[in-house]
């Protein structure tokens, strides 16, 4: 703290008469000293300040230019992405429509093939029934024929005596004899 107050005391100290120096006491400086200091600052600082401002201006302009280029690139990428999105959506719609029509086509094919299979099964069933009916009819005919034959044989055996039997044989032999004479 003491150093701080000492520095204010030294600022208030005037240089001795006859010497040239700057008054470091800001409150006690006169306008001539201030104008000299400002003149030196303006003269030498003007170029530095202009260079600093020009550099800053160039950096800002470059940044704006780069930002504009990046913005243009981003807009172009956005447009490309939108175009790809529209293309993908169109293709998805095509696939969706084709998929639905493919499903409907497959469903129709399945219904048609099922109908054909059912029709074939119906035909096989009818053929099997017809075959079984024919087989049953043939079996019944065969049994009826066997029973009729057995009945006829039984009737013949009961009706025929040896004498009748011999006459029938002789009559048949006679018929064969006349047939032979006719054919010769």
Curated annotation (Swiss-Prot):
It is a single-pass membrane protein. Disulfide bonds: none annotated. It holds the Pfam family ATP-synt_B. It is found in: Plastid, Chloroplast thylakoid membrane. InterPro entries: ATP_synth_b/b'su_bac/chlpt. It comes from the Eukaryota. One of its GO terms (molecular function) is proton-transporting ATP synthase activity, rotational mechanism. GO terms for cellular component: chloroplast thylakoid membrane; proton-transporting ATP synthase complex. The chain crosses the membrane at residues 27-49. Keywords: ATP synthesis, CF(0), Chloroplast, Hydrogen ion transport, Ion transport, Membrane, Plastid, Thylakoid, Transmembrane, Transmembrane helix, Transport. In plastids the F-type ATPase is also known as CF(1)CF(0). Belongs to the ATPase B chain family. F-type ATPases have 2 components, F(1) - the catalytic core - and F(0) - the membrane proton channel. F(1) has five subunits: alpha(3), beta(3), gamma(1), delta(1), epsilon(1). F(0) has four main subunits: a(1), b(1), b'(1) and c(10-14). The alpha and beta chains form an alternating ring which encloses part of the gamma chain. F(1) is attached to F(0) by a central stalk formed by the gamma and epsilon chains, while a peripheral stalk is formed by the delta, b and b' chains. F(1)F(0) ATP synthase produces ATP from ADP in the presence of a proton or sodium gradient. F-type ATPases consist of two structural domains, F(1) containing the extramembraneous catalytic core and F(0) containing the membrane proton channel, linked together by a central stalk and a peripheral stalk. During catalysis, ATP synthesis in the catalytic domain of F(1) is coupled via a rotary mechanism of the central stalk subunits to proton translocation. HAMAP family: ATP_synth_b_bprime. This is ATP synthase subunit b, chloroplastic. It comes from Capsella bursa-pastoris.
């Amino acid at each position: 703290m003491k150093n701080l107050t000492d520095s204010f005391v030294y600022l208030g100290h005037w240089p001795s008469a006859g010497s040239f120096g700057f008054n470091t006491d800001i409150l006690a400086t006169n306008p001539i000293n201030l104008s000299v200091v400002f003149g030196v600052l303006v003269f030498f600082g003007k170029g530095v300040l202009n260079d600093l401002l020009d550099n800053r201006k160039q950096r800002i302009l470059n940044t704006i230019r780069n930002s504009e280029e990046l913005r243009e690139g981003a807009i172009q990428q956005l447009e490309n992405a939108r175009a790809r999105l529209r293309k993908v959506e169109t293709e998805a719609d095509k696939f969706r429509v084709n998929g639905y029509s493919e499903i409907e086509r497959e469903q129709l094919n399945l219904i048609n093939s099922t109908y054909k299979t059912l029709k074939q099964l119906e035909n096989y069933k009818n053929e099997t029934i017809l075959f079984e009916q024919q087989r049953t009819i043939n079996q019944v005919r065969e049994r009826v024929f066997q029973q009729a034959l057995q009945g006829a044989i039984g009737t013949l055996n009961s009706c025929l005596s040896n004498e009748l039997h011999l006459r029938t044989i002789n009559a048949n032999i006679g018929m064969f004899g006349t047939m032979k004479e006719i054919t010769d």
